[in-house]
Amino acid sequence: MLTWALIFFIIAIIAAAFGFGGIAVAAAGIAKILFFLFLVMFVIFLIMGLLGRRGPPPV
């Protein structure tokens, strides 16, 4: 449990360094692009999964 606390503490320190620095604006722009990209991919794969369903596989 202490190991996980230490790992998350280090991640928080790194996130704070990025957040208090000037990188946050650029990272937010990239995050928005990635969000919409993965949202579109999710919808496409969801539709493919729903339309591609068939009966159970043969035994």
Swiss-Prot record:
The keyword Membrane applies. This is UPF0391 membrane protein LPC_1949. It is found in: Cell membrane. Keywords: Cell membrane, Membrane, Transmembrane, Transmembrane helix. Belongs to the UPF0391 family. One of its GO terms (cellular component) is plasma membrane. Its main location: membrane. The keyword Glycosyltransferase does not apply. It is a multi-pass membrane protein. The chain crosses the membrane at residues 5-25, 30-50. Coiled coil: none annotated. Pfam families: DUF1328.
